[in-house]
């Protein structure tokens, strides 16, 4: 039994030993095959003998794929000569990088031997590996895009070449330090490589091969040359004369530039500081430079490629720039950009202008020639110089730009008295036309112009500093004549240049109402309105028209002008559509006479005449002097805003005539009905209450506010009493009348436009409600007399008002559709205007207080004003 067991054991051991020996034999044979394969690789024996099996297989596969690529790309008839083989060894030494062949899957099937010089990793270590194992993860997507065909293989050679060219940047691991030491792969750093090449397509089977019975798909690979970008701080080779350094901010603005740019391109380093480099790029290269800038900010280094930089005096030069981002060693933040600029050519097309900076060179070469004309050292006559200058400028009109003075040039004044020209008198036989008697007309109408007639847009102003608004044009230092007579001189005396210039500057064209109205409508009147502060604490602004002296109470015979009829300028003149039968029946003669007179009045009276034959309006004064007598200042000075309204109201013709202080003629504008519809939306119109009164004294804002409160209080008391009278005399305590009065009071709100103000004080600003209240002199509303024509009223009734004539120089007219008949009583006044299509806008107390004008130079009550305010309060 034991012998059988021993025999079985020995037989099993023999089989195991035989299997082990067979395995050793197979492995030895495999090793021999691998070594034979390694020796077949185009590698040195010292390298191939130390390869493991995996490396041998990896390198062998890469070699076979490379050989297939070369065999498909290169033609069969090409035979390498010995000279070409010798030159192959010199190519790698001359190149600034290494060559790599990458398949469409990312396998590096070939790498040149000099890769270890730049990257530290050897050819054997990288060949056959995937490129994604040694590149930056952020660049993988860009690498994949460059490995594949973007637009397909194409059908033509041209389309194939355009779609297969590649130029990109990638970051790869580098084990070589700046000092030349080699570190471990785990301690490797990223180095930016500039990769340029193309994608090649080849067949899987060699040509004319019978082994490939079936059609195999096409293969593609990327053949690139990878050039590392050298850091500026590690440059050992000195820069040549065709290279200059520059430093930029992160947005490519120059912060430093080498002096060699002056002789290379023509720019001074100082004139480049602070300017962007994009200003000097050629327009066709701006897109590529923008892409290079993006790569620089993303990857830290970039090579711009060949581009054109504009020269200073025209043309451009070809450059290539290597940019590097310099990081702050403390916080590792980007600090600046260092650029090494290689000038590749001379200035090309220097006679072509590509930018505005190059236009300066157009006139610079001719400066010496032009200045020689005015050189006083020459003995050439003045006439010859003038003729030469005229011919020169006629041939080259662009030289006129150089004759204009530039900042820093000396300005030479021209002396007109140095040359005497004998010219015939141009005005010897000049005769004034009979229709334009200048001197005689001026002398005959001198009194009238001094007293009444005002030119358009002129207002007398005192030269008080602080109270006048600066005119449209600055004051001139030269003296000007005070009247047109000063422009005349005898024919024996020579004409003055100053007077001639002022004569040509005057506007001598006749102005008709249409043209003047057009000129006036072009002005922006809203910007000329008085300043109204939103809060009551703003600084006081002086009005455009300063305070004027008191006007005499005696009426003047000459017609005066004011701005109460300014609405006729801005409103369409449609008397037929607006007046209605109420006005046309009562005042046909007045309208006809007014129309006849307006055809012959000058523009100043048409614009500013209020029809007042009495005293002068406060907004007008004595006859203004023309522009020539104001020291060269512009006469575009504006009076206060006209007292107009937004909304329409009834136009009490008879009442206004009763409130006038003097006997007015029939043809005055005081009695004419309005000739414009109540649609004045472009201009802000204010009532006479807001406009303020310019009487013998100027009312302060505090006094106006106090008077408004007293007027409101008296109005409510009086209307309550009047309502009780109309309702049957019920006492205020009764429920029906008191409740009805509260409802009416809430409707009125203190500022109801349908109820007049009952103020009888002579010291308050006159307005339409004040004038209406003076008709009855304290009578209730239901006892108001019906309207009467102005002819039935006498001057005695007008004198009952007791107001100073200065306050009523300009009458205020309300514009609106006519009413059928005057109604009496409070209830009738509330219900009467309901059929009218227009109503006055409701003004709140805040609106009234905000729109109070700021008159005078004092904001506090003083002297007589304070006494009047105290008297009214008590």
Curated annotation (Swiss-Prot):
The modification 4-hydroxyproline is found at residues 405, 530. Residues 495-541 are annotated as: NTAD. Residues 26-53 are annotated as: DNA-binding. Expressed in most tissues, with highest levels in lung, followed by heart, kidney, brain and liver. Predominantly expressed in endothelial cells. Also found in smooth muscle cells of the uterus, neurons, and brown adipose tissue. High expression in embryonic choroid plexus and kidney glomeruli. The modification (3S)-3-hydroxyasparagine is found at residue 851. Residues 171-192 are annotated as: Required for heterodimer formation with ARNT. GO terms for biological process: angiogenesis; blood vessel remodeling; cell differentiation; cellular response to hypoxia; embryonic placenta development; epithelial cell maturation; erythrocyte differentiation; gene expression. The keyword DNA-binding applies. Residues 304-347 form the PAC domain. GO terms for molecular function: cis-regulatory region sequence-specific DNA binding; DNA binding; DNA-binding transcription activator activity, RNA polymerase II-specific; DNA-binding transcription factor activity; protein heterodimerization activity; RNA polymerase II cis-regulatory region sequence-specific DNA binding; RNA polymerase II-specific DNA-binding transcription factor binding; sequence-specific DNA binding. The keyword Protein biosynthesis does not apply. Its main location: nucleus. Residues 464-484 have a biased composition (Low complexity). Keywords: Activator, Angiogenesis, Developmental protein, Differentiation, DNA-binding, Hydroxylation, Nucleus, Phosphoprotein, Repeat, Transcription, Transcription regulation, Ubl conjugation. Residues 84-154, 230-300 form the PAS domain. Residues 834-874 are annotated as: CTAD. Transcription factor involved in the induction of oxygen regulated genes. Heterodimerizes with ARNT; heterodimer binds to core DNA sequence 5'-TACGTG-3' within the hypoxia response element (HRE) of target gene promoters. Regulates the vascular endothelial growth factor (VEGF) expression and seems to be implicated in the development of blood vessels and the tubular system of lung. May also play a role in the formation of the endothelium that gives rise to the blood brain barrier. Potent activator of the Tie-2 tyrosine kinase expression. Interacts with HIF3A isoform 2. Efficient DNA binding requires dimerization with another bHLH protein. Heterodimerizes with ARNT; heterodimer binds to core DNA sequence 5'-TACGTG-3' within the hypoxia response element (HRE) of target gene promoters. Interacts with CREBBP. Interacts with EGLN1. Interacts with VHL. This is Endothelial PAS domain-containing protein 1. It comes from Mus musculus (Mouse). The lineage of its organism: Eukaryota, Metazoa, Chordata, Craniata, Vertebrata. The gene is Epas1.
